Amino acid sequence: MKKIQIINGPNLNLLGKREPTVYGNASFEDYLSELRARFPQCEISYYQSNVEGEIINKIHEVGFEYDGIVLNAGAYTHTSIALHDAIKAVTTPVVEVHISNVHARESFRHVSMISAACRGVILGFGLDSYRLAIDRLCDRRFRRLSNRINN
C-alpha cells in the first residue's frame, strides 16, 4: 500500500469558511474522506500547521519513508527558502498543489520558492488539485519518469 502524506500550510485549516469564492465551501476534512474512498490502494495521512517550522519537521519526518507528499504550503510557497531546502533534503517526491490559480491572483503570489524543489506543480483545479496529485503519486510510472526528469 502506498503511503501519501498531505501537508497543508497556513490558513488552510479555514477551508470552507475562508474566502469561499476563492477556496469553495467544503472543509478539507470532508474532502479528505472522499480522497481516502477514491484511493483505497493508498494510505493517506493528513497534517496541517500554520507554523513554518512544524511543516518542515513533518517533511523531515515522512520524507524518507513515504511514497509521496502533497504539499500546499499556502503563503509560505512565496516566501520560504527553508521549505525549499527541506524538500530538497528528502528523497520522497513532493507535488506542490494550490486550490486556486495563483497566477490569476495578486502578483506577489506569482513566484513560488518551492516549485523548483518539487517533482511537479498542480494548481487552479480547486480541491481536485489534491486528487490529481495523489493520482500521479500513486502511479508507479510517475516515480520512474520523474526520477529521469529530475536527475
Name each region found by the language model.
Residues 62-69:
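Short acidic/histidine-rich motifs immediately flanking catalytic phosphotransfer sites
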Residues 10-12, 74-77, 100-102:
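Short glycine-rich anion-binding loops that position phosphate/pyrophosphate groups of nucleotides
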Residues 14-29:
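Glycine- and acidic-residue-enriched helix-capping/strand-helix junction motifs
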Residues 45-53:
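Short beta->alpha junction loops
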Residues 1-4:
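Extreme N-terminal starter segment of soluble prokaryotic enzymes
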Residues 104-147:
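Short, glycine-/small-residue-rich phosphate/pyrophosphate-handling segment
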Residues 80-89:
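Short Gly/Thr/Asp-enriched flexible loops that form oxyanion-binding sites at enzyme active sites
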Residues 89-105:
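Short, acidic/small-residue loops that bind anionic groups at enzyme active sites
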